[in-house]
Amino acid sequence: MQVTETLNEGLKREIQVMVPMKDLEAKLNERLDDTKGKIKLNGFRPGKVPSSYLRKMYGKSFMAEVLNEIINDAPRSILVDRNERSAVQPQIDINEDQKVLDGEADFIFNLKYEVLPEFEIKDFKDIEITREIADVSEQEIDEEVKKILSSTRSYSEGDAPSEEGDRVTIDYLGKIDDVPFDGGTGHDVQLVLGSNQFIPGFEEQLVGVKAGDTKAISVKFPDNYGVAHLAGKDAVFNITVKTVSKPDELKIDDEAAKKLGLESLDRLREVVQGQIENQYGLMTRQKIKRQILDSLDADYNFEIPERLVEIEFNNIWAQVNSDLQKSGRSFEDENTTEEKAREEYHMLAQRRVRLGLVLSEIGMKANIQVSESELQTAIFEQVRQYPGQEKEIMNFFRRTPEAIANLRAPIFEEKVIDYLLTHIKIKDKKVTVEELMKEFDESDAIEKSLVKKKTASDNKKSNEIKKKSTMKKV
């Protein structure tokens, strides 16, 4: 097999592979000889079938197997020999030629691929981040406990007009342009006024009604409503009030906690505090991770494989369009254009690919591994999301290596972040809950803003790096 490099520009490689006709002939003869002693054909004794007859019967199919074997094995062996790592599976271009199948020509094909870039991991011990910590107040625990115990609250029917906090039982029929719509009908629906269970403006118009009342209320579905064909539409609901019930006194005591399966009110408070602390901890963790990624992003600006960027962008873009479709919104509603959005998300894809490569390299040098038990836990978490389909989901993961890889990647990334947290400088800072949540909600906008700033400042440097990498042999 003769291997000739035909392109070496930056990370791009093109390789021409030529397998001489005589080598193909030798491999074909091996298969024919192996088959000769095994095959049984009428009119021939075992092992006595002439090679010429076997060639006539099976020559082309055997040669096709030989070619497929070469195509499957060659990319891996070539990359090993060249000490290169391909960013994605190499593209194989084959010039189909009947003469090759007939054993009358050399087999020539081309490999096209991008190599993973080589770069040095910089010292990250000087990275300094701020760990924001929000304490859980007694008031917050009280409010959450009250909210939880409200689900156990009893109500008593009465004749008085409804007030906020009362529970009404209603039938309703919704119409748009005087035509009923799917999902707009309900019978014996219980609704606590002020719970914001329904769209804005709906519950407010039921304050003051009595049992037996009928009422038509006009509302407008929010522009970002989850059902696209209803988003932004005006609707009229014809309401029949069946009962109005006043809330009984809410008891916050051990007996109320026992209704939830807990031994005491103190235990309920412990559970609630733990849940809130876990929620805030996840937010803190996400902000810590963002700071680490921002620091790493500022330190690296090497060329990255275009194909990896394309794959990442396509994933981001599909999610963006799916979110827009579900909300019934457009790019114009988000104060941008599709062209501008594509540019921004393409830069975001570049950032994520580069950071992914940096984290991968750090993890490899630190010998970070994802254990089988960690992977199994992740698989079981996925299975739990599809009750009744456990067997099918498990089989899916068994036969889909890509799905396993998609589960392994975020686990590996989080373990690398854990590793970095033990080697960087961390300064704790007390913040309010509002400060913690406000900045957390703005994180995506912050990330895209950082991408723009970095891209603007690095354009010249990036061009210089590309010129240098074109000359470099990897």
From Swiss-Prot:
One Gene Ontology cellular component: cytoplasm
Localisation: Cytoplasm
An example Gene Ontology molecular-function term: protein folding chaperone
HAMAP family: Trigger_factor_Tig
Enzyme Commission number: 5.2.1.8
Every PPIase FKBP-type domain range: 165-250
GO biological process, one term: protein unfolding
UniProt note: domains: Consists of 3 domains; the N-terminus binds the ribosome, the middle domain has PPIase activity, while the C-terminus has intrinsic chaperone activity on its own.
Family: Belongs to the FKBP-type PPIase family. Tig subfamily.
Role: Involved in protein export. Acts as a chaperone by maintaining the newly synthesized protein in an open conformation. Functions as a peptidyl-prolyl cis-trans isomerase.
UniProt keyword list: Cell cycle, Cell division, Chaperone, Cytoplasm, Isomerase, Rotamase
Predominant cellular place of this UniProt entry's protein: cytoplasm
Positions of region (Disordered): 451-474
Keyword hit for NAD: no
Biased composition (Basic and acidic residues): 451-467
Catalytic activity annotation: [protein]-peptidylproline (omega=180) = [protein]-peptidylproline (omega=0)
Classification via PANTHER family: TRIGGER FACTOR CHAPERONE AND PEPTIDYL-PROLYL CIS/TRANS ISOMERASE, TRIGGER FACTOR-LIKE PROTEIN TIG, CHLOROPLASTIC
Enzyme class: isomerase
Protein name, UniProt field: Trigger factor
